[in-house]
């Protein structure tokens, strides 16, 4: 939200480019037996109706599909920064996928080559990259990466004619304010540009899920309904963000 505030106040100049995605090691989630995570002693590899929670349905997407199966998590905040459906729009998309290796390797490493799931043919590329062109000229790169060993990241980068912010490493650079060719730590910038919604409700939000995001999003929606204002996200946003999934499959 602080980064959005920086954009709104013109800190980065005219926006040129953004990156985002869903980069989250979900291999254990995709084969969860409901009793143990598979890397723990005694865990079993399961998927489908005999599995637990997301492993009942999520893993099947990796079998049937090859595209960005979850673009909305990352593209939402970027779309807000780029004024998508509010003076700007997505124009075109081109996507590509790597080979599919991670899930099969995970099964073999944890269950052996003779495990029944080792026969499953996974279609989803381990890393799917979609490039989007916007009507106002900007480009966006969206990455889906859930079958690889890695720390969690949404890969945010917002870049303009006068600077940029990257969430990996918490970096900010602003021309004529940062030291030349040296990153600033984002903490001081975030304090300066803290969003009023966050600063006002930070204490309450801290008790909610996903680092406070759940609280802020629900508060913003309920506040809009209560005051009869436009919702912060609407059905047109949902359609634009979700279309990336189907279009990436068509492109690949």
Residue map of PLM features:
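Predominantly a Rossmann-like dinucleotide-binding segment in NAD(P)-dependent oxidoreductases
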Residues: 1-121, 221
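Short glycine/serine/proline-enriched coil/turn segments at secondary-structure junctions
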Residues: 26-28, 148-151, 166
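C-terminal glycine/acidic-rich active-site capping loop/insertion
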Residues: 42, 99-125, 129, 133-134, ...
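Conserved loop-to-helix N-cap of the C-terminal "lid" that shapes the substrate pocket in Rossmann-like
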Residues: 68-71, 232-238
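Glycine-rich phosphate/pyrophosphate-binding beta-alpha loops
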Residues: 124, 143-152
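A contiguous, mid-protein "functional segment" used to position or interact
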Residues: 234-252
């Amino acid at each position: 939200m602080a980064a959005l505030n920086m954009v709104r106040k013109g800190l980065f100049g005219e926006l040129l480019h953004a990156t985002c995605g869903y980069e989250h090691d979900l291999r254990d989630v995709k084969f969860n037996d409901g009793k143990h995570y598979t890397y723990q002693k005694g865990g079993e590899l399961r998927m489908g109706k005999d599995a637990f929670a997301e492993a009942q349905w999520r893993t099947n997407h990796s079998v049937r599909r090859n595209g960005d199966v979850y673009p909305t998590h990352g593209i939402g905040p970027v779309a807000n920064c780029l004024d998508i459906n509010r003076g700007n729009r997505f124009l075109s998309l081109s996507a590509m996928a790597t080979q599919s290796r991670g899930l099969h390797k995970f099964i073999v490493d944890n269950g052996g080559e003779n495990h029944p799931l080792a026969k499953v043919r996974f279609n989803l590329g381990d890393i799917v990259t979609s490039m989007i062109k916007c009507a106002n000229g900007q480009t966006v790169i969206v990455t889906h990466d859930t079958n690889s060993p890695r720390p969690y990241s949404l890969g945010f980068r917002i870049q303009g004619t006068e600077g940029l912010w990257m969430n990996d490493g918490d970096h900010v650079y602003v021309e004529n304010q940062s030291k030349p060719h040296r990153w600033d730590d984002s903490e001081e910038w975030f304090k300066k540009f803290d969003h009023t919604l966050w600063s006002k409700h930070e204490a309450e939000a801290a008790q909610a899920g996903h680092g406070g995001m759940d609280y802020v999003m629900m508060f913003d929606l309920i506040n809009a309904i209560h005051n009869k204002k436009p919702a912060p996200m609407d059905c047109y946003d949902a359609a634009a963000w979700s279309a990336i999934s189907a279009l990436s499959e068509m492109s690949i």
